[in-house]
């Protein structure tokens, strides 16, 4: 990593002039670069700035939130179908249901690279819309999968098609919002997991009121409802969601320039269609990527438990099917509240991202310890602890914002995201690193659940405790690393030149090539 820093210091970045009339490397492939140059002399009033931000919040944010909510409900639809005899209908035995739950993440693994390449090469909203339509079809096909092997195949392809969504939305959040705005907005659209859980619980509650001998069967209705809604939503994304501020039809030309100038201040650029081999090496050598990979993998194991087996764990505490769906929605509400509180703190308290994540991780660790060591007779104590582990989403969201706010260079961000989120391929750095850890952690999660351990589920609760403890340690190390780099750069180069750093970001330089870049803690 030191040699990367040395080359960065030799390169330097010239301060941005009022007009740039010479060729700069990477500008032809950098989305929004021409608008950035045009906007350099733009005089923007506070009123215009606020109006553009509100337009983005009222247009972009709801689409992100609904897309992520549908993905979550579709991915965890087995959790609800299982309440209505899905295992019995397919004749599942032993760990068959565990493999079926995990198979979607194996699909993520193989789908991440092609989806990441497509998002970088073509309009992101087109790729995401097609992905949404295809995974919606897979959800509908679950009703026609009358054998274990066919259901496994459908779940695998569902994972492939879903692989574009979370990394795509994470990258696109950085296209639209400033570094200060990203955490709260990311927390808002990621709170869709909680909203999706609540909606899914009440859909299940409604289905539970229907006759048990009806046709189609009640578990089939779950897939019909969720799959149909997803297919319809794909058309909304295709026709309404823009790829980047520079081509947003709901903005005027001047508003597009303002939107591009806003995110130029992130020092990370918007999007670059060219693949950078140099950024691949940087991505794999980046200590941030490594720490995020470990933390997300560790936390994804308990996440796989909660997503796939929450209804079973709550039901085996002694509650009816209807009561189980109601109680599960409380945990989803905890997730929403934790994300909004965490995002608000980060927005208003400078350099509080990782400290906020640490507080949430500590709460999860304590809650997991209570689940592991409280006696089975203490039903409500264990249930409240199970609700509280949903606050782990704060730490995961901070991991995503670390990529969108603290990693420059489009290929670099993409690789890190893939490695951390669902796992993707070895060529697109940061985002894909995170997605890789997320994928395999969630794949492993269902296998720490053993039905014979009900109602205490010792293996699952110990898995929760260990996973959250590792995540807590990684976030503390990440905080120490970025703080040290900021301080050493200030000593070596003096105060950062903000204009030069903005220019470097729009040219798709990484944070290691841009000596004026400072991490947001």
Model-predicted regions and their roles:
Residues 74, 90-91, 114, 122-123, ...:
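Helix-breaking motifs and short loop linkers at transmembrane-helix boundaries and internal kinks
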Residues 79, 278-343, 400-401, 428-429, ...:
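Extracytoplasmic gate region of multi-pass secondary transporters
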Residues 109-149:
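Conserved MFS/SLC helix-loop-helix module at the cytosolic interface between two early adjacent transmembrane helices
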Residues 133-146, 362-376, 390:
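C-terminal ends and interior cores of transmembrane alpha-helices
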Residues 1-70, 94, 238-273, 455-521:
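Intracellular terminal tails of multi-pass secondary transporters
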Residues 110-123, 338-352:
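Helix-to-loop junctions at the C-terminal end of transmembrane segments
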Residues 76, 105-113, 163, 197-198, ...:
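Residue-level signature of mid-helix packing/kink "hotspots" within the transmembrane helices
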Residues 183-216, 224-230, 417-445:
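Glycine-rich segments within core transmembrane alpha-helices of 12-TM secondary carriers
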